[in-house]
């Protein structure tokens, strides 16, 4: 009887909004890195058939040319669609406590169109910042 091989699949696709300003920097080895976090909302009906909202947060990371190119376009509130793979990290912190993190290594990122209300709010914020300067 042939051995059944399970495929190794590690793919993720998410759409959401950046919840903070991304952190762009060059690493000691010269690699460009962009880190951020997105919020993904899910609506569902509970047992009483009432609509509920659930929000999940995911750390994302981009490298090299993609990081450099998107660093100026991505800001808090930017809607994005990403595809990539999950990568886990474990370490011990300064108190010798075990820590664990899963982040999305982004392969493709598409900035989604903002709706008119978002654009109007951003324009008001930009105008306010200019007036304050």
Which ranges hold each PLM region?
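OB-fold and OB-like beta-barrel modules that bind single-stranded nucleic acids
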Residues: 13-18, 38, 76-88, 106-109
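A beta-strand/beta-hairpin structural motif
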Residues: 46-72
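Hydrophobic residues on conserved beta-strands that form the core of alpha/beta folds
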Residues: 33-35, 57, 106
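ABC ATPase A-loop
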Residues: 7, 53-55, 104
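A contiguous, mid-protein "functional segment" used to position or interact
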Residues: 98-99, 103-108
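Acidic, gly/ser/pro-rich intrinsically disordered tails
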Residues: 1-10, 24-29, 45-50, 72, ...
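Core FKBP-type peptidyl-prolyl cis-trans isomerase
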Residues: 12-53, 100
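Beta-rich strand-turn-strand
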Residues: 63-99, 112-115
